């Protein structure tokens, strides 16, 4: 069972949708699905060199209440930060909580 105090961050679940710009060209936009309480644990980061520039990557585990419709196509918005969902785990298959392994999109 998850205690209410454990989930102390408000996050927004978003899904990508293709829409058309004013010229009729397809563009990807993100649409809010739900706002939920969660706990964000930043687990580390790394710097790497790619495409002739230095990049940084931060990983996190986000814990939230169970939602049957969760998918890795979604992303998490927390304030002005965005997280790509890499995997979703249902600890012990109890359908009480989900652990989302994520990386921050910079």
Residues covered by each model-derived region:
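Polar/acidic, low-complexity leader/linker segments enriched in S/T/G and N/D
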Residues: 1-2, 9-16
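Short, conserved turn/kink motifs that form compact alpha/beta structural patches or helix kinks used as
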Residues: 4-7, 20, 25-106
């Amino acid at each position: 069972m998850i205690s209410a105090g454990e989930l102390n961050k408000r996050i927004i679940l978003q899904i990508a949708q293709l829409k058309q710009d004013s010229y009729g060209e397809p563009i990807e936009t993100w649409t809010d699905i739900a706002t939920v309480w969660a706990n964000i644990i930043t687990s580390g980061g790394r710097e790497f060199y790619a495409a002739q520039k230095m990049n940084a990557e931060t990983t996190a585990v986000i814990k939230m209440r169970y939602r049957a419709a969760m998918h890795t196509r979604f992303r998490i918005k927390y304030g002005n930060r965005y997280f790509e969902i890499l995997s979703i785990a249902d600890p012990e298959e109890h359908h009480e909580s989900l652990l989302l392994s994520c990386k921050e999109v910079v």
